[in-house]
From Swiss-Prot:
The modification Phosphoserine is found at residue 51. The lineage of its organism: Eukaryota, Metazoa, Chordata, Craniata, Vertebrata. The gene is Rem1. Belongs to the small GTPase superfamily. RGK family. It comes from Mus musculus (Mouse). GO terms for molecular function: calmodulin binding; GTP binding; GTPase activity; transmembrane transporter binding. InterPro entries: P-loop_NTPase, RGK, RGK_GTP-binding_reg, Small_GTP-bd, Small_GTPase. Induction: Repressed by lipopolysaccharide stimulation. This is GTP-binding protein REM 1. Residues 267-286 are annotated as: Calmodulin-binding. Pfam families: Ras (PF00071). Keywords: Calmodulin-binding, GTP-binding, Nucleotide-binding, Phosphoprotein. Residues 64-73 have a biased composition (Low complexity).
Amino acid sequence: MTLNTQQEAKTTLRRRASTPLPLSSRGHQPGRLCTAPSAPSQHPRLGQSVSLNPPVRKPSPAQDGWSSESSDSEGSWEALYRVVLLGDPGVGKTSLASLFAEKQDRDPHEQLGGVYERTLSVDGEDTTLVVMDTWEAEKLDESWCQESCLQAGSAYVIVYSIADRSSFESASELRIQLRRTHQANHVPIILVGNKADLARCREVSVEEGRACAVVFDCKFIETSATLQHNVTELFEGVVRQLRLRRQDNAAPETPSPRRRASLGQRARRFLARLTARSARRRALKARSKSCHNLAVL
């Protein structure tokens, strides 16, 4: 009888040890853009990454700045604008995102970035941006995660360092990738030359940055996260570009009452304008002047 009791106790212990843990108690790794949560019922806390399609809501008028609480009311949900930061490591993406969130003291464990939400008042109208600094984390995973990151944004900010030419070349390649990903829709893209305070170490001139923006049809601005120079102008410019794109897409196409010229006539006029060298220079100069104006398309 004693032997049987000991064998039953061993069997019970062995069964308890072999019982698998439930799925809900296993560890979850936040910070991956391509991993969707099982029940996305509210925004993650600031400083954490979200899934490819995070829940969106419209903050209440009483809220100011950035918030991590969600509301279950039916009228409080509205699409937010997701701004994806792209660029090589060390160009200052996380510094710009932290300044956007007014979060100066960063946790050492947040060096790979995260997601920051804040409501900005631009031109008398409130707009909520969700800035996603998850590009470095996605580069640690498979390439399809990076592709998901390139598709997740309402707008894109491509950052390079003016003191690092290789980061400038990488920014140009990222612009080409975005063009391939967003062929049908024209999303706002802003090329940012960060670390403008390192003037003595400059490897990329302002003229080169503007020329690149003109060629790739995007906006351009130089910033300094260290001096907090043009950081506010950058994110307010993102808001204005989003609004302009929204208005441009919503505007109905009104047919002109005049008779349109034939394709051959328009082609001849276009070629005649291109043959004039001065006209080309004027057009390029006009485009280079407008590429750094974030208040116009």
